[in-house]
């Protein structure tokens, strides 16, 4: 769907308008302390999902799964660059290294895809296990991979 500029809470599709069923689907989770948005995606090149994460060059550059966190949020959590953190959603959790960077929004945490639990060098639980398979876009049926509510704590 396409976001409509005049009705920001609706997605427009030729011939129909889809309105979210619940205007505040995350209110309950926010009340439970899930105050950050988990964004997942591809890490920077040359690491490309399972094709390259076994290469020694990628292992040198990114030996561990990381979570990018804004410096202001990191300070409020008493985190320093390189600390081990737990990123938790209502569906699971992972452990990663904190990468403190001003290149991310204050209320977000970025965790890359492509690290799996069967890696020979640094086994981690995949971030995909943390997604809510029931929370789907009403038009495309795509699962929510970009704004899943989470909380971050020091491991």
Task: Give residue spans per PLM region.
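Long, contiguous, secondary-structure-rich segments that constitute the structural scaffold
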Residues: 49, 54-68, 72-155
